């Protein structure tokens, strides 16, 4: 029996990055031998065991053979005669097909070290094309390591295009697509994930609502980058610097979906694209089974982001109504989330990357003023039933009006 550290732990250690999870491969052993040594078996489809002390995963070396469609159609073979090289060959990328023995020596049968040095994401073997999930995984790795200047090897991107055009991605379940997307949204450069999907044709298949934005012009006065798809990715890049939250990042990605519905004869204007985008957000989220809380924020951002841009022109009643519409009294975090997504929208434009966004500050200040109006005082004043709500709203509007007179500049 020989045990090797494999995959991401080896890769990230060589890149000087923190190692989160450690996975091990066991060569020359059997399930019974592992059980006798105190390991706990957890894998149903293939032999994976938990170490009795560390609870890290130890998998018997195995090979995989395509036996059906999609990413689940594989037959696994695990036996003492499966070599380490056999096991590493089934992995997706060469940088993930590295192993380390107990002496610290790196085993690299597929030039993963060279690709690490050259910052290349390259597939190990043609078997890559048998698993459509790998298209999403490579796009996610490209986003995860973009800050280290990694790029996808030309032949790997070509294979990803072939897989997409062959209809392989249609075998992916919504849950897997969303899981990879959610993971990509946590990276430092989530926009790279969607750019890679576009480069290989997968964006049109998996995210047609986003793909439809490319080639749709916006007024050059407000959008020097002109193309709405490019603006969307710039905005996603910007919000990744402002917030680590997946729901904020996803909402930003979806903020301009409505512009994809504008008839070409009306370009470059997109009047009413916010409310129009809400339906597309719902469509996308229903198809990918996006969690409700993430969906709800994306709907609100699509509907109201343009309203925040015009904040100085809003009357106090409209401002308080906005807080009602986003359910801020029960979910106050939405005020900050809306401020961040709107700021990213403004700064996600060519030449505006460092722009100030006072509307975000005014929104936050107005919220502090509105929520500081005490409900208790209204009740103690003798109001009952629906009168409490009406009087509370009246007092909130009055408080915001007083604040706006002093703190918010009047529109020209």
UniProtKB/Swiss-Prot annotation:
CTP binds at residues 8, 11, 91, 137, 140. Its EC number is 2.7.7.72, 3.1.3.-, 3.1.4.-. Its cofactor is Mg(2+); Ni(2+). Keywords: ATP-binding, Hydrolase, Magnesium, Metal-binding, Multifunctional enzyme, Nickel, Nucleotide-binding, Nucleotidyltransferase, RNA repair, RNA-binding, Transferase, tRNA processing. ATP binds at residues 8, 11, 91, 137, 140. GO terms for biological process: RNA repair; tRNA 3'-terminal CCA addition. GO terms for molecular function: ATP binding; CCA tRNA nucleotidyltransferase activity; cyclic-nucleotide phosphodiesterase activity; magnesium ion binding; phosphatase activity; tRNA binding. Magnesium is required for nucleotidyltransferase activity. Mg(2+) binds at residues 21, 23. The keyword Metal-binding applies. The keyword Nuclease does not apply. Monomer. Can also form homodimers and oligomers. Belongs to the tRNA nucleotidyltransferase/poly(A) polymerase family. Bacterial CCA-adding enzyme type 1 subfamily. A single active site specifically recognizes both ATP and CTP and is responsible for their addition. Catalyzes the addition and repair of the essential 3'-terminal CCA sequence in tRNAs without using a nucleic acid template. Adds these three nucleotides in the order of C, C, and A to the tRNA nucleotide-73, using CTP and ATP as substrates and producing inorganic pyrophosphate. tRNA 3'-terminal CCA addition is required both for tRNA processing and repair. Also involved in tRNA surveillance by mediating tandem CCA addition to generate a CCACCA at the 3' terminus of unstable tRNAs. While stable tRNAs receive only 3'-terminal CCA, unstable tRNAs are marked with CCACCA and rapidly degraded. Comprises two domains: an N-terminal domain containing the nucleotidyltransferase activity and a C-terminal HD domain associated with both phosphodiesterase and phosphatase activities. This is Multifunctional CCA protein. The gene is cca.
């Amino acid at each position: 029996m020989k045990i090797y550290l494999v995959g991401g732990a080896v890769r990230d250690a060589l890149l000087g990055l923190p190692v989160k999870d450690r996975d091990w491969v066991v060569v020359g052993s059997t399930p019974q031998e592992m059980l006798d040594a105190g390991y706990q078996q957890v894998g149903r489809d293939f032999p994976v065991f938990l170490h009795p002390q560390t609870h890290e995963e130890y998998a018997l070396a195995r090979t995989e053979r395509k036996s059906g469609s999609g990413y689940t159609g594989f037959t696994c073979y695990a036996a003492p005669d499966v070599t380490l090289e056999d096991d590493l060959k089934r992995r997706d990328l060469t940088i993930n097909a590295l192993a380390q023995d107990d002496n610290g020596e790196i085993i690299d049968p597929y030039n993963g070290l060279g690709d690490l040095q050259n910052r290349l994401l390259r597939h190990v073997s043609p078997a890559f094309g048998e698993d459509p999930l790998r298209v999403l995984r490579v796009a996610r790795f490209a986003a995860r390591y973009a800050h280290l200047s990694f790029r996808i090897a030309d032949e790997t991107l070509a294979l990803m295009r072939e897989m997409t055009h062959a209809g392989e991605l249609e075998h992916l379940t919504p849950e897997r697509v969303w899981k990879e997307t959610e993971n990509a949204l946590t990276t430092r450069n989530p926009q790279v994930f969607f750019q890679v999907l576009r480069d290989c044709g997968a964006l049109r298949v998996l995210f047609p609502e986003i793909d439809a934005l490319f080639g749709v012009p916006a007024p050059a006065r407000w959008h020097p980058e002109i193309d709405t798809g490019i603006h969307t990715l710039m905005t996603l890049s910007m919000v990744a610097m402002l917030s680590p939250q997946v729901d904020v990042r996803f909402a930003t990605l979806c903020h301009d979906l409505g512009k994809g519905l504008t008839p070409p004869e009306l370009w470059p204007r997109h009047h009413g694209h916010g409310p129009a985008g809400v339906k597309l957000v719902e469509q996308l989220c229903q198809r990918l089974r996006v969690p409700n809380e993430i969906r709800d924020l994306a709907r609100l951002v699509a509907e109201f982001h343009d309203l925040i841009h015009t904040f100085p022109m809003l009357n106090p009643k409209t401002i308080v109504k906005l807080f009602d519409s986003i359910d801020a009294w029960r979910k106050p975090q939405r005020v900050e989330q809306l401020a961040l997504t709107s700021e990213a929208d403004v700064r996600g434009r060519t030449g505006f990357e460092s722009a100030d966004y006072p509307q975000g500050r005014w929104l936050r200040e107005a919220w502090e003023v509105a929520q500081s109006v005490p409900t208790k005082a209204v009740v103690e004043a003798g109001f009952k039933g629906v009168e409490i709500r009406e009087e509370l709203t009246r007092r909130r509007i009055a408080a915001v009006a007083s604040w706006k007179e002093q703190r918010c500049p009047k529109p020209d």
